[in-house]
Amino acid sequence: MKRYISILLLAAFCFLLSGCSSKQQTETEQTEGISETVEVERPEEMPEMCQIGKMEFALPTNCTYYGEAEVEGSETIYLYMGDYQVVVSSDPFPHDISLTDMDEAALELYIGSLSEGSYQIAGCQAAVVGKYPYLLLAYHDEALETDYSVYHTIIDGQVYTFVGYREGDEPVSEQEQEFLYELVSTMTEAPEEDEA
């Protein structure tokens, strides 16, 4: 899982460096010297609901929907609230379990595996938000002097990650933490499409 978190955060950082102009249609991700172009789909107007994996979540009115992309098989959605940035991703989990299925020992090993990347976990707590259990993780990247708030859950073998952060050494405000919580609290199963 450290690979998924690292890829997600690296993709988000590269996404920001690309300029984020409204006319820009592609994002370039630099990963170990390999350049990859990711097409970002941009709708004409902001949707009320976003779907990712088998789930969907509601967008608050005070945010900007930047678009979505697929980064190394990970569905990814980008949102902004002023200088605060949120990246939502969905990845398949190699084992058919949910977060609630893990016993304490397995959960500790899992959390340990998340902290093995360049982003070190500064804090972790379990939380139930809406209907679903989450790990609320706090990451710190010393090189970027940036803190990340991460809501992370596994539902039916699918990992859902909500990452919220600000660039540089600006602390994440209480309002921004509430914004991320609001997004997570609206997540629910997407209705199945009728097969005609």
Annotated model-derived regions:
Residues 16-19:
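C-terminal motif of bacterial Sec signal peptides marking the signal peptidase cleavage site
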